[in-house]
UniProtKB/Swiss-Prot annotation:
PANTHER family: HYPERKINETIC, ISOFORM M (PTHR43150), L-GLYCERALDEHYDE 3-PHOSPHATE REDUCTASE (PTHR43150:SF4). InterPro entries: GAP_reductase (IPR047628), K_chnl_volt-dep_bsu_KCNAB-rel (IPR005399), NADP_OxRdtase_dom (IPR023210), NADP_OxRdtase_dom_sf (IPR036812). Its EC number is 1.1.1.-, 1.1.1.2. This is L-glyceraldehyde 3-phosphate reductase. GO terms for biological process: DNA damage response; methylglyoxal catabolic process. Belongs to the shaker potassium channel beta subunit family. Disruption phenotype: Cells lacking this gene show 23% decrease in the amount of acetol. The deletion mutant shows sensitivity to glyoxal. Aldo-keto reductase that catalyzes the stereospecific, NADPH-dependent reduction of L-glyceraldehyde 3-phosphate (L-GAP) to L-glycerol 3-phosphate (L-G3P). The physiological role of Gpr is the detoxification of L-GAP, which may be formed via non-enzymatic and/or enzymatic racemization of D-GAP. Also contributes to cellular methylglyoxal detoxification by catalyzing the NADPH-dependent conversion of methylglyoxal to acetol. However, the catalytic efficiency of methylglyoxal reductase activity is more than 2 orders of magnitude lower than the L-GAP reductase activity. It catalyses: a primary alcohol + NADP(+) = an aldehyde + NADPH + H(+); hydroxyacetone + NADP(+) = methylglyoxal + NADPH + H(+). Keywords: NADP, Oxidoreductase.
Amino acid sequence: MVWLANPERYGQMQYRYCGKSGLRLPALSLGLWHNFGHVNALESQRAILRKAFDLGITHFDLANNYGPPPGSAEENFGRLLREDFAAYRDELIISTKAGYDMWPGPYGSGGSRKYLLASLDQSLKRMGLEYVDIFYSHRVDENTPMEETASALAHAVQSGKALYVGISSYSPERTQKMVELLREWKIPLLIHQPSYNLLNRWVDKSGLLDTLQNNGVGCIAFTPLAQGLLTGKYLNGIPQDSRMHREGNKVRGLTPKMLTEANLNSLRLLNEMAQQRGQSMAQMALSWLLKDDRVTSVLIGASRAEQLEENVQALNNLTFSTKELAQIDQHIADGELNLWQASSDK
């Protein structure tokens, strides 16, 4: 039986222009970092994607190494795209990235032209696409000249394999340089994807949002819920069914050492604030990011379709009082959760 999307889907989502481009992204986008590998049930993935699109979420964000195993998220997404979303391809924004380890040998990671363009070709094959809407340099590679990375991104657009290009976890200084390098190719930098949330505010401290705004570049925040810390799930310890319990000390994963007393105090205060606002902690965390018009979109993940419905309700209240903002600034400590700092510090 052919699946038909909700005909009212565009009436319940906000869409924002991405920097100075003509492209609009949904305020909430779906990230496929977790829960879309071969270890996850395909029907669960199908339900999540269908629910997202029915809610007006038109942007699906992937990377070459998402899984596990690496590449499997793109393979699964490609299958579901063919089976459920083929008729809606022109209503979707599909992005992928390359930067982290993907295959053995010296050409399987980084920012070289060899790696980036080979990875893009592999991603297109896995997803069954002729092009992606956005192709990212996933991280800074200090061993590759930025001029080379920029040339690869420009080639992706010029060859018709990507409509736009972006970067992720770049410092303001490197972001500015990438803007200028791409400008030489007459290719605009569309978007930057940084880790950003209430407990990880390096974006604020570094002035990245100002750099993006000054150059007409959009911003899409990933880990807006601090990989689950800002959902309220860990207020009373580590549940047995939680990702923190499953992942242990995984690199760039959610680990027990993140539950410091300072972070727990911050979570308790944020939970109280959310209750006073009539929101869940997760909804308030999303609202806090989207209160700033410089944030184009926020990348959310989901293990269940129902989570998406709760998250979308965050859009009903994006206003914060002066008192609320002051309380956050004064009492919410940095949680030392920027696990991608090795890239943004370079």
